[in-house]
């Protein structure tokens, strides 16, 4: 028995201060001193078994430690990778929203998919706009400009289609504007821009306009503002009725036997939340209709300039946002 | 259907709504802003509301049943149509033609 275990020899030589066993932890030392108390130089079966168990425990502990360190190392690599991805995405102007939000929203993947789709849309838009800019600078003919303008309008329709699909999935993500830069978010109305505000910006840039065009754009600015106000009023009534629904029956109602009424209340509130999607859809419909009407009022060349001016405005707003985020802070 | 035809032709502008419908609230607001004072019929307050809702749904095909807007006794559409007609100026013209507004 003694010759099968390499440790036995060592412990008979010196059992109180054992360098090998000592490195394996306190348990081992206790076991070693135990054995020295009982009978010097001799180890019974029990002690041997205990020593073997200790060695096994120490071996497992070392393995666990090794696995743990490996895991840490993997996490570190993953983190570096994520940081690099985030950096790349930032450079491309993509906004990645907080993971916390997405974990909580049911359409977490939908939100991510929409963000990706939207950044692709933006990329395509940049290309179109570069084309439009060079065509304008090269004094291209109306027919050539018309084709590009129609392309841009079709691209806007595509955006509203993408948004409508995304709203079915995660209406709060769209309303939050987390897919836009912070500065754009500051001007957000019902998940997008206010057409009436854009028209105000354009007025100076489209000179010279005929009397008729001037009136057309002014009218359009007014009608889109009226429609925006009307939709905002509807949203207010939605909030009010949601608050009324949620607060009804919370006072004085006994805690027991009200599960059914609580569930009924929640079902009603859910129904009301469901109409949020309709508001986003109508707001986008308003945006599209306003752009289309603007183009009907303007000449082809003016339309091209207007679309470019709108595009440049949003580009600058996004650039401003990046500068603001990167500003030095004390 | 009979009752809808009846009610919708009694005034130049008529809107069928539900008291709980917030988009209806938006469309009503828009009409008031334009200076029209449409007759409002809330389906959930009408004893024949259910039948009327069914008839309106059939009328608007893909549209929701409410809001349902009639101008000059003619069905114009729901929220989407109203916003579109408002932006291109044709809603105002329809309201003028039906003598719901004068200016």
Swiss-Prot record, chain A:
bZIP domain sequence ranges: 44-107
Annotated region (Leucine-zipper), positions in chain: 72-86
Major localization listed first in the record, in broad terms: nucleus
Domain named DOG1: residues: 111-327
Signal peptide: none
Chain intervals with Basic and acidic residues compositional bias: 35-47
Entry-linked InterPro entries: bZIP, bZIP_sf, TGA_domain
Family statement: Belongs to the bZIP family.
Any one Gene Ontology molecular-function term assigned to this protein's record: DNA-binding transcription factor activity
GO biological process: DNA-templated transcription; negative regulation of DNA-templated transcription; plant-type hypersensitive response; positive regulation of DNA-templated transcription; response to xenobiotic stimulus; systemic acquired resistance, salicylic acid mediated signaling pathway
The organism's place on the tree of life at top rank: Eukaryota
Coiled-coil region(s): 45-142, 217-244
Expression (tissue specificity): Expressed in the whole plant.
Keywords assigned: Activator, Coiled coil, DNA-binding, Hypersensitive response, Nucleus, Plant defense, Transcription, Transcription regulation
Region (Basic motif): 46-66
PROSITE patterns with a match to the protein in the record: BZIP, BZIP_BASIC, DOG1
Residue ranges, annotated region (Disordered): 1-48
A Pfam family it matches: DOG1
Localization in the cell: Nucleus
Job of this protein: Transcriptional activator that binds specifically to the DNA sequence 5'-TGACG-3'. Recognizes ocs elements like the as-1 motif of the cauliflower mosaic virus 35S promoter. Binding to the as-1-like cis elements mediate auxin- and salicylic acid-inducible transcription. Required to induce the systemic acquired resistance (SAR) via the regulation of pathogenesis-related genes expression. Binding to the as-1 element of PR-1 promoter is salicylic acid-inducible and mediated by NPR1. Could also bind to the C-boxes (5'-ATGACGTCAT-3') with high affinity.
Assembly description: Binds DNA as a dimer. Interacts with NPR1, NPR3 and NPR4. Interacts with GRXC7/ROXY1 and GRXC9/GRX480.
Protein name, UniProt field: Transcription factor TGA2
Keyword ATP-binding on entry: no
GO cellular component terms, A-Z: cytoplasm; nucleus; RNA polymerase II transcription regulator complex; RNA polymerase II transcription repressor complex
Keyword Electron transport: no
Swiss-Prot record, chain B:
Subcellular location, principal: cytoplasm
Keywords: Cytoplasm, Disulfide bond, Electron transport, Redox-active center, Transport
Entry-linked InterPro entries: GlrX-like_pln_2, Glutaredoxin, Glutaredoxin_subgr, Thioredoxin-like_sf
SS bond partners: 21-24
Top-level taxon of the source organism: Eukaryota
Family: Belongs to the glutaredoxin family. CC-type subfamily.
Designated name of the protein: Glutaredoxin-C11
Domain Glutaredoxin: 1-102
Subcellular location: Cytoplasm
GO BP term, example: negative regulation of transcription by RNA polymerase II
Functional summary from the UniProt entry: Has a glutathione-disulfide oxidoreductase activity in the presence of NADPH and glutathione reductase. Reduces low molecular weight disulfides and proteins.
Gene3D superfamilies: Glutaredoxin (3.40.30.10)
Organism name: Arabidopsis thaliana (Mouse-ear cress)
GO CC annotations on file: cytoplasm
PROSITE patterns recorded: GLUTAREDOXIN_2
